[in-house]
Amino acid sequence: MTINPLTREICEIAHYLYSKGLTPGKSGNISARFQDTIAITPSGVSLGHVTEDEIVLLNMRGDVLAGGNNPSSELNLHLEVYKNKDVQGIVHTHSSYATGFAMSGKKIERLEGFGERTKPFLKMVNYAQPGTMELAQMVGEGLKEEDVIILENHGVVATGENLKEASLLAEFVEETAKIQFIARVLNNIEF
């Protein structure tokens, strides 16, 4: 894959995530790595409307190589994950159900599809201010042994061997959270 198809794929997946409600408004960000180049969505642009020419290309130090926009405010989060884990795609969403769990402090159970169920819940990292190096380092460390984590009071970060895999995992987390929310509500209602 070359950079041009990579920026096209980022836009396609960004539009898909937006259409599924995983990145409402101007929230969320995604990136993909090709060799030593990272392509990331810009800051302040809706993922539902982002265009290829708005995608920012950077090196692994975070130096901008191409693109007229500022990179996502969560650039350091993406860089830390790439430094700590051999993945090619990262998706950060603010989807309703998963973020609801993150804000309530309630954990999302691991269901089939999350690999071995040696751990009963998805990992949640403690709250840190969005866009900070503190959050970036916590996420980088938290994803060393996981493919997806929940950010307390914030959202979800999913990784994958490619961007499509990361986006499908983020979507699966949201559906899992939705199912668990519905089940918990129904368990407390008498018919």
Predicted regions and their residues:
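Glycine-rich flexible loops
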Residues: 1-191
